[in-house]
């Protein structure tokens, strides 16, 4: 493993383990004799398992019912691959599951097939512990070595960068339940360059899950993936319940088979859950709060809402304050000023913000509220790695030019308090809401955001990042909030974490504020340092001298 690139450090050399003892410690039920899983004179694999085993497509996806034994069949295929010499297509295989128990169950199946296929390997199982310097935690991996071929099968954690620098086939198990599936697939697909395959196996986890989106892309002809669909009824027709009866030493009968199948459906929490778990029908709501259809219906068909991006160059912080100010001022006048000048004075305007200093994005979303109370995104500003002062500069440039500005809501969590306070000092608490993002806040305001979509009362920019960010809103313990996953920005250069979704929700919250309307006379009545047009004012700069040491 390329540990330097992956920020993983081996804590000890690989050591051989007793598979039964390890399984006992983790409470995993394993089979160590192929005769326990295969009746005499019957094929090892059931029909759907055999079809999956034999599929040589470079990218294969299986949407399946629970506990149909597809990973077991995949283990047999992987042993064949790793045991062959390179000249016959042999290579390493890397398995990515979401839990240690899954990894051990898979490795146990690989060991079973390695022994069953005779002299292909000694089938010893090894473990090795690595220290993840990013997550500050230990990661345990299991491995089977094949001395004749020189290849191995290794079970890794689901951290995407673990695949960087590796070469071999990749198996992603229960893919729909990985937090960073998009990053994981990106890392896995890179291995295709040298002929390796990617095998993706999962039960569904909602219609808006990336796993389902990949399946739809394949079925609609946009991707060249091979897709297998294995419902519980498909598996039963191919002999699953008969095989279960053999392994568990129960008598089989058609009546018992029907009762078993009907009991699974009857005892599911509800019909939608049963259809998803056993029928390969993803829930319409899934974990996502806003459906893809609902989001796309709110997107402007004319593509006339611009998304403006400013990413500070690498040497930005080494420039003088005057140079940074000049660069940003030029950008504001070239990019923002024409859009601000074009805003209608007949509409009220509010703004929502999501803050980040490094890594994620700061997003400003101005909303126009028309006389008939419809809301429309005016434009969007996305800032990456921009200094605090220049974020303030851009913010005040916008706020001071919004016609009939009535309020703004800011993410004041952590360092976000800086921008929120800067705006509040100028416009006052009646106009600026400084918000600490909590489950209680999400529970109150996310439903109002959803209501705007359901009432078709909001128009937003038509862009892939719009969709990606809004799909990050997931229901967790009954509360709609931003999930832990991340997506790549346009061009794949930076991370996103639902930044636009938070900013848009903030803007909707600002639309409920009752601040007075800021007009030209009001602006001129403010003291000079409160107008937002004199960012070099000494008094205001002195106020923020704490910035360098405080953040």
UniProtKB/Swiss-Prot annotation:
Key words of the record: Endonuclease, Host cytoplasm, Hydrolase, Late protein, Magnesium, Metal-binding, Nuclease, Viral genome excision, Viral genome packaging, Viral release from host cell
GO MF, any single term: metal ion binding
Location within or outside the cell: Host cytoplasm
Regulation: induction: Expressed in the late phase of the viral replicative cycle. Expression of late genes is activated by the viral late transcription activator C.
Signal sequence region: none
InterPro entries cross-referenced by the UniProt entry: P-loop_NTPase, Phage_Mu_Gp28
UniProt-listed Enzyme Commission number(s): 3.1.-.-
Any one GO BP annotation for this protein: provirus excision
Gene3D superfamilies: 3.30.420.240, P-loop containing nucleotide triphosphate hydrolases
Required cofactor(s): Mg(2+)
Subunit structure: Interacts with the terminase small subunit gp28.
Family: Belongs to the T4likevirus large terminase family.
Function: The terminase large subunit acts as an ATP driven molecular motor necessary for viral DNA translocation into empty capsids and as an endonuclease that cuts the viral genome to initiate and to end a packaging reaction. The terminase lies at a unique vertex of the procapsid and is composed of two subunits, a small terminase subunit involved in viral DNA recognition (packaging sequence), and a large terminase subunit possessing endonucleolytic and ATPase activities. Both terminase subunits heterooligomerize and are docked on the portal protein to form the packaging machine.
Protein name: Probable terminase, large subunit gp28
């Amino acid at each position: 493993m390329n540990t330097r690139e992956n920020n993983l450090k081996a804590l000890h050399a690989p050591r051989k383990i007793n598979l039964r003892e390890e399984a006992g410690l983790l409470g995993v039920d394993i089979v160590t004799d192929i005769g326990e899983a295969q009746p005499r004179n019957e094929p090892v694999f059931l029909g759907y398992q055999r079809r999956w085993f034999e599929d040589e497509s470079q990218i294969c996806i299986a949407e399946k019912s629970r506990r149909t034994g597809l990973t077991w069949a995949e283990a047999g295929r992987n042993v064949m691959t790793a045991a062959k010499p390179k000249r016959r297509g042999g290579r390493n295989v890397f398995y990515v599951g979401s839990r240690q128990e899954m990894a051990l169950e898979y490795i146990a199946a690989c060991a079973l097939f390695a022994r069953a296929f005779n002299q292909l390997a000694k089938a010893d199982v090894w473990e090795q512990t690595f220290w993840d310097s990013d997550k500050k935690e230990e990661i345990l991996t299991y491995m089977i070595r094949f001395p004749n071929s020189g290849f191995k099968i290794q079970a890794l954690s689901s951290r995407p960068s673990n695949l960087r620098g590796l070469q071999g086939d990749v198996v992603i198990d229960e893919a729909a339940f990985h937090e960073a599936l998009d990053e994981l697939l990106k890392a896995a697909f890179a291995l295709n360059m040298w002929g390796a395959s990617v095998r993706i196996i999962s039960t569904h986890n909602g219609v808006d899950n990336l796993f389902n989106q990949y399946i739809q892309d394949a079925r609609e002809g946009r991707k060249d993936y091979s897709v297998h669909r294995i419902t519980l009824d498909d598996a039963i027709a191919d002999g699953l319940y008969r095989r279960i009866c053999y392994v568990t030493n129960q008598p089989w009968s058609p009546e018992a088979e029907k009762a078993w199948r009907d009991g699974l459906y009857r005892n599911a929490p509800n019909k939608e859950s049963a259809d998803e778990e056993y029928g390969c029908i993803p829930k319409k709501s899934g974990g996502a709060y806003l459906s893809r259809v609902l989001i796309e219906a709110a997107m402007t068909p004319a593509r006339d809402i611009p998304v403006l991006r400013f990413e500070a160059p690498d040497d930005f912080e080494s420039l003088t304050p005057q140079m940074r100010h000049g660069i940003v001022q030029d950008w504001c006048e070239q990019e923002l000023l024409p859009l601000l000048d074009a805003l209608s004075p007949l509409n009220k305007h509010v703004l929502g913000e999501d803050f980040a200093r490094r890594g994620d994005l700061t997003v400003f979303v101005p909303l126009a509220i028309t006389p008939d109370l419809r809301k429309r995104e005016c434009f969007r500003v996305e800032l990456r790695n921009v200094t605090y002062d220049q974020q303030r500069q851009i913010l005040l440039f916008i706020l001071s030019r919004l016609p009939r500005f009535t309020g703004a809501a800011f993410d004041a969590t952590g360092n976000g308090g800086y921008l929120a306070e800067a705006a509040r000092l100028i416009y006052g608490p009646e106009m600026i809401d400084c918000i600490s993002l909590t489950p209680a806040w999400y529970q109150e305001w996310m439903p109002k955001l959803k209501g705007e979509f359901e009432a078709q009362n909001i128009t937003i920019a038509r862009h892939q990042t719009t969709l990606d960010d809004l799909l990050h809103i997931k229901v967790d313990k009954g509360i709609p909030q931003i999930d832990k996953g991340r997506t790549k920005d346009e061009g794949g250069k930076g991370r996103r974490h639902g930044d636009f979704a938070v900013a848009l929700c903030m803007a909707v919250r600002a639309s409920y504020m009752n601040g007075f309307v800021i007009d030209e006379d009001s602006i001129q009545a403010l003291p000079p340092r409160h107008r937002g047009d004199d960012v070099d004012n000494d008094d205001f700069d002195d106020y923020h001298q704490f910035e360098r040491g405080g953040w």
